[in-house]
Amino acid sequence: MHYLWELIQQLFHPKSIIEYGGLTLLLFVIFAETGLFFGFFLPGDSLLFIAGLLTATSEESTSINSEHLFKVPILILIPSLLASAVLGNFVGYYFGLKTGDVLLTRKDSWFFKKKYIYLASDFYHKRGGMAIILGRFLPIIRTFVPIFAGIVKLEFKKFALYNFVGGFFWISTLTLAGYFLGKTYPALGDHLEYVVVFLIIISLIPIAVTYFKNKARQIKLKHNEH
């Protein structure tokens, strides 16, 4: 039980995912967060950034035994991550397409909460197909927007285009940001804990803003009704 709890904790830590699971676990986590409804808690943004940073610091390192080595060339890393992200969204879309009605009547659980579907629905109705592109940069939203696109039966060709474009910008922006920062400041590889905390805070800001905007709108609507 103790081992299982430690394993779950490691899944929240980007550095641990990369160090213990390498490229294989990294790709699986990106796939799961973008394609499986219970993957919403996984640290996609910070994971991409840290992967880019560790790739850069590994290239700069002269130590064979460095704990921060992540020997995956950036030209292999980015296409691999993109493939996982695109495939994940296709799985989410198909899942929503086939189980939409059942999903909306399903009871809430630790792995699934309908409020996330409604959050994705609100985001989708405001921005249309662009929600699939922009949603890539928002935790939770990026997990449930492709599922909702399947529920509303968005045309597959359109979804495929939005999926690829969104995945490309999400993967390349965050991974290359980490990569070039690591090239500029290689010492950051020794202070990953601080980097991860900063990234988590930054990634949660858009979700918090959206949440409070929705709350304010609901309060305003109730006030107008009275």
Where are these predicted regions, by residue range?
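Membrane-interfacial helix-loop-helix
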Residues: 1-28, 53-147, 151-154, 158, ...
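Transmembrane alpha-helix interface/packing and boundary motifs in multi-pass membrane proteins
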Residues: 27-48, 203
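Alpha-helical segments in transporter systems
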Residues: 34, 160-162
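Hydrophobic alpha-helical transmembrane bundles that constitute the permease/transmembrane domains
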Residues: 140-144, 164, 168-171
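Pore-lining and gate-forming transmembrane alpha-helices of multi-pass membrane transport proteins
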Residues: 163, 167, 194-198, 202
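Transmembrane alpha-helical segments of integral membrane proteins
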Residues: 171-182
